[in-house]
Swiss-Prot record:
This is Altered inheritance of mitochondria protein 18, mitochondrial. PANTHER family: FATTY-ACID-BINDING PROTEIN 2. One of its GO terms (cellular component) is mitochondrial inner membrane. Keywords: Mitochondrion, Transit peptide. It is found in: Mitochondrion. It holds the Pfam family Chalcone_2. It comes from Vanderwaltozyma polyspora (strain ATCC 22028 / DSM 70294 / BCRC 21397 / CBS 2163 / NBRC 10782 / NRRL Y-8283 / UCD 57-17) (Kluyveromyces polysporus). SUPFAM superfamilies: Chalcone isomerase (SSF54626). It comes from the Eukaryota. GO terms for molecular function: heme binding; intramolecular lyase activity. Residues 1-41 form a transit peptide.
Amino acid sequence: MFGRVFNRSSPIIRLSVRTITSLNGARASVNRPLAKTLISNGNHIFNKKLYLLGLFGITSGYYFTISNGGSAIINDENVNDDASKTVSVDSSISPLPVNYSKNEYSLSNDYSLLGYGIRAVTFLKFKIYALGIYVADEDIKSIAKLFSTSYLSSTFIDTDKSKSHPENVKEALNDPKKSLILIGNLLDSGIKMMAKITPVRNTDFNHLRDGITKTVLNHPNANEKKTELENGLAQLKETLSNKGSVAKNDDLFIELKSNGSLVFTHNNRKKNKAIHLGTVTDPIVGKFLFSQYIGGPKPLSPPTKETVTDKIYSIV
């Protein structure tokens, strides 16, 4: 069901909304686009009730009643039958798990979803892949700690005394220049993360490699770090030198280790097999890649950056 419209002429409307949940306690729920697309011409109570339902992770059926005087548009594309465990990014591929265990796909850590979105080429108007950003469970507390340090707080974050610390963090992360610095500090702290790329159309390793390389080179500081990047990008080329294809709905896992290295794993769904592709040991490649994924002036996937920002806001 997409874009269901209830007109003003309806005297009383009853909506059945099922399996609405939160993303690990985040202020924005897993089905965040659902909450964002509610329009009721001033019926703020309706929107607030939905928000609270998502916040507290209630998954049982629930009914809302809207009296005459407003219209509502509801988009439930992100509502899944098991929404507490997955989030739908695009209907053409499998939903993203909210959690990964290190026992799965030979991953190095247990991970929780930090943000998600679609990577799309705007001028060609087509989607390329779904992007999920995960953080190691043991490092979640480190995010709050980092954004609360006295130096960052006084210099970059808590500059508006009329706002709370979380509100100032969110505003700073939405500032292109501050975001670049704050995310850079986060990545320099040794935080362990993972990016999950799931193509929405058949592709190959050459295209994925070229895309990742371009993403790294588009980092605002890439020009001044060209010499340092050469070795790391050569490693990246070698790691993704496989001439094979990557089918739609396959997964490419990119783990960012505490030392800044990147570990690449291909999940071949047809063969039900996880294949280790290699490691890029130069930390500048990992830092620039994940910086482009979750922050900076020109994020690779704006929806992903937005959901990551919302999650950090809920953590701090």
